[in-house]
Design a protein with these regions (language model features):
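Alpha-helical substrate-recognition element adjacent to the catalytic core
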Residues: 1-128
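C-terminal cap/substrate-recognition subdomain and adjoining C-terminal extension
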Residues: 95-279
Length: 281
């Protein structure tokens, strides 16, 4: 689903600030099973520290296919001054620290020269406790976003969320709603990959502790409704994930082209959307 505000109906020379806004869950990636695993690990770790970034590196499938290439493109736009800021606008219910861990991972993964994501707009409430003071509702709205970020209302916004919010469909918003991203890993594949990683070997040195840890993780996934018996991937699903990321990159490039203050003609430039997936070894 694509929504372009009236502002983007034609090419124009614009000095308005351009910002990018991403939802977290099922947009940047699929992180529910990772949160369950991390919570369990924290209960087991006593005498040593597990690096969260290194843990997530074990599971590159938790990130949406192609998202690192997309974020690298945005980082270059920030570096050359075309993109003013990059935000996360989330309703994640696991707390600020959890969201910060994922965003810090992405910051560290993309660039060490500057902070890629400028601000996280967190959930309105978690367990009925108000978290983001300048939000007024759990729904995502343009007014709440502006109040939280203190951006001028002349700002143009490229917004990506796998959920449709009618109050984010405004004149200066270019809104992309991709299909929700679901990682393809089975529950057994997740837990076995961790158990036999360098951290798993240290944390769970004996067969009995490995068995107990695995059983507890599976039970938590079942309670949470995220237990997957089989690996959920096919050639068609992979092709669909690739296509979604290609289309997302295309629309991001078009967004900058439509609002480029250097563009002095209305001649349409070709927009390439090829990319290669960044793999973690």
């Amino acid at each position: 689903e694509i929504y372009k505000g009236q502002y983007f109906s034609k090419y124009k020379k614009s000095r308005a600030k351009k910002v990018m806004v991403f939802d977290l869950d099922e947009t940047l990636g699929s992180f529910v099973d990772l949160e369950i695993l991390w919570s369990l690990i924290e209960r087991y770790t006593k005498s040593f520290h597990i690096n969260f970034d290194e843990l997530l590196d074990i599971f590159p499938e938790f990130l949406r296919y192609g998202i690192l290439s997309i974020l690298e493109y945005i980082a270059n736009k920030k570096k050359n001054g075309e993109c003013y800021k990059l935000f996360v606008y989330t309703n994640n219910q696991c707390g600020k620290k959890w969201t910060e861990r994922i965003i810090n991972y992405l910051n560290n993964k993309i660039t060490s020269d500057f902070r890629l994501f400028d601000q996280i707009v967190n959930a309105f409430k978690i367990n009925n406790v108000k978290i983001e003071l300048n939000r007024t509702t759990h729904k995502k709205t343009y007014d709440d976003f502006i109040n939280c970020t203190i951006l001028p209302k002349t700002t143009t916004i490229f917004f990506v969320d796998d959920v449709s919010y009618k109050d984010m469909k405004k004149e200066r918003i270019y809104y992309i709603k991709p299909m929700p991203y679901k990682h393809p890993l089975s529950t057994n594949e997740i837990i076995n990959r961790f158990i036999y990683s360098k951290y798993g070997i240290i944390l769970l040195p004996r067969d009995c502790t490995r068995y107990a840890f695995k059983a507890e993780y599976i039970e938590l996934c079942m309670k949470n409704g995220t237990y997957h018996l089989y690996t959920n991937t096919t050639k068609t699903m992979l092709e669909n994930d690739i296509l979604i990321s290609q289309k997302l990159m295309y629309h991001i490039k078009e967004y900058f082209l439509l609002t480029n203050k250097q563009n002095k003609t209305c001649k349409r430039k070709s927009v390439s959307f090829s990319f290669t997936r960044k793999r973690n070894n």
